[in-house]
Amino acid sequence: MPIFTTPFASLELLRQPHQPNEPLQAFDAADEYLLNHLHEQGLRAEDSLLLLNDSFGALACSLAGRCQVTSSSDSHLGFIALENNLAGNGLNRDAVRFLPSSETPQGPFDWVLIRVPKTLALLEEQLIRLHGQLAPGARVVAAAMVKHLPRAAGDLLEKYIGPVQASLAVKKARLLLATPEAKAAPHSPYPTRYRLDKPALELINHANVFCRDGLDIGTRAFLPHLPRHLDARRVADLGCGNGVLGIAYALGSPQAQLTLVDESYMAVQSARENWAAALGERPATIRAGDGLAEQPAGSLDLVLCNPPFHQQQVVGDFLAWRMFQQARAALVTGGELWIVGNRHLGYHAKLARLFRGVEQVAANPKFVVLKASK
């Protein structure tokens, strides 16, 4: 197991979801650089420290018990990783307060350590929410690997926090040190809103929702082909994003009981608000979760899924494969998984390893819609 060693601790850390023979680590040189800088500057036990986007808990576990630590992230998988890594290293769970990104951190904070996220809209929303939450003399430091650090990240820090100084690169990582200054209360451009014609919906997307400014092209290819012939009462929208697939299915199936689940807290927040706008008080289960890991076996008739092909900056089909396995376990015998995916990802062959039958329902030059029967 990889060991993460800094002046604060030596830790064994795992990613989430954990894969056997995992080639990737739960930390990187940017985490190390941040913690070395914090140690050099001097951390006091009475300091209140906020972590933003600590992917798998490397920062939080290193600082647990050394000051008042709040960790905020948009990833439920990141939250699971934090809990597992605290427990795996014998650390007190109560030493770190976790806050989903759908909630605003309450300061005042003496330190804010930020891992620059892939989606800069998320960073912008997080910086906006820091207004009025910084203690006098607070220090705000962002970090990233150089290859994942766009110039716009520094521009956002300067816009919402204050003047920014970039560090030298160390082990291909860089820090951005922002000096807070008095600023007028900012207006957030999030959530964004857009309209669909079929079905007729007005949808919102909070800052970290995939394809924030409109309907993603995969979902657009999927919507005209949603199953309607099934007597499916128990239906899940797996990796629901803003909930549009589940909502569209529910509008055409008044008796269906819907479960919408995503690992992004902002996606879940968007889905809840969109469901309420489209379907009022009609009951549904809309939750953050590790896919269908918590779903009882044989409890679903139909699963709809537009699977992701990346986790932060890591691209691959491991998340989709895991979701397919979860769907198979949750479906009744005879139940169906319907997905949309890029042609080149070869999902047909992968589904054929898990399901009794796989059919192509529709296709265009870029996407295929597939039906897999258990």
Swiss-Prot record:
Q: Which GO terms describe its cellular component?
A: cytoplasm
Do you know which InterPro entries this protein is assigned to?
DNA_methylase_N6_adenine_CS, rRNA_m2G-MeTrfase_RlmG, RsmC/RlmG, SAM-dependent_MTases_sf, Small_mtfrase_dom
Q: Which family does it belong to?
A: Belongs to the methyltransferase superfamily. RlmG family.
UniProt protein name: Ribosomal RNA large subunit methyltransferase G
DNA repair listed as a keyword? no
Q: State the reactions this protein catalyses.
A: guanosine(1835) in 23S rRNA + S-adenosyl-L-methionine = N(2)-methylguanosine(1835) in 23S rRNA + S-adenosyl-L-homocysteine + H(+)
**Keywords associated with the record:** Cytoplasm, Methyltransferase, rRNA processing, S-adenosyl-L-methionine, Transferase
Q: Which organism is it from?
A: Ectopseudomonas mendocina (strain ymp) (Pseudomonas mendocina)
Q: What is its EC number?
A: 2.1.1.174
The lineage is: Bacteria, Pseudomonadati, Pseudomonadota, Gammaproteobacteria, Pseudomonadales
